[in-house]
Amino acid sequence: MLDAFSRVVVTSDAKAAYVGGSDLQSLKSFINDGNKRLDAVNYIVSNASCIVSDAVSGMICENPGLIAPGGNCYTNRRMAACLRDGEIILRYVSYALLAGDSSVLDDRCLNGLKETYIALGVPTASSSRAVSIMKATATAFITNTASGRKVEVAAGDCQALQAEAASYFDKVGSSID
């Protein structure tokens, strides 16, 4: 996983060049948006349990067979595993958002996830749906539009961060499908 600074250094080093020009400008923008990025990650991690439990509840409401005998969320052990997986996915999305780089998702979360779910008989459509619900909830926190929950936000538009976070959730969802 490379953060924005490491990426610039590695790229410049590969070219045997000093860091400068557009690379410095991109780092300057990254720093200027740093407080918004930190706030966005804080909103997600502060509400992680709510985001994950709402996503799993929504997934179950849309597919009640998941909690029927034989369903993948039937028994406390399976429900706990489902919630745990949601927490892990959300945690890695927050890491990616903090770093401004999705490689942590590829390296530590998504590599083999679909194959594992298939081997365990986990319905990938339901898992993907839970991820899309997490996406909607998390991005609402980032833009401070989550119903019933308003927080003090850093000044400025957070649409770019919302789109970035959404792209990470989309990456997770498409890797499961």
UniProtKB/Swiss-Prot annotation:
Q: Where does (2R,3E)-phycoerythrobilin 1 bind?
A: 72, 77-78, 82, 84-85
Places the protein is found: Plastid, Chloroplast thylakoid membrane
Which Pfam families does the record match to this protein? Phycobilisome
Q: Which residues carry this modification: N4-methylasparagine?
A: 72
Example of a GO cellular component annotation carried by this entry? phycobilisome
Superkingdom of this entry's organism? Eukaryota
Q: How is it modified after translation?
A: Contains two covalently linked phycoerythrobilin chromophores and one covalently linked phycourobilin chromophore.
**Where does the chain bind phycourobilin?**
50, 54, 61, 147-148
Q: Its topology with respect to the membrane?
A: Peripheral membrane protein
Quote the record's binding site residues for (2R,3E)-phycoerythrobilin 2.
35, 39, 158
- Give the record's GO biological process terms: photosynthesis
List the keywords (alphabetical).
Answer: Antenna complex, Bile pigment, Chloroplast, Chromophore, Electron transport, Membrane, Methylation, Photosynthesis, Phycobilisome, Plastid, Thylakoid, Transport
A further note on this protein reads: The light-harvesting antenna system in red algae and cyanobacteria is formed of phycobilisomes. These are composed of the phycobiliproteins phycoerythrin (CPE), phycocyanin (CPC) and allophycocyanin (APC). Cyanobacteria also contain phycoerythrocyanin (PCC). The phycobiliproteins all share the same subunit composition and organization with variations in the covalently bound open-chain tetrapyrrole chromophores.
Subunit and partners: Heterododecamer of 6 alpha and 6 beta chains. The basic functional unit of phycobiliproteins is a ring-shaped hexamer formed from two back-to-back trimers contacting via the alpha chain subunits. The trimers are composed of alpha/beta subunit heterodimers arranged around a three-fold axis of symmetry. The phycoerythrins also contain a gamma subunit which is located in the center of the hexamer.
Similarity remark: Belongs to the phycobiliprotein family.
Function according to Swiss-Prot or TrEMBL:
Light-harvesting photosynthetic tetrapyrrole chromophore-protein from the phycobiliprotein complex.
Question: Could you tell me what this protein is called?
Answer: R-phycoerythrin beta chain
Give the originating organism.
Answer: Griffithsia monilis (Red alga)
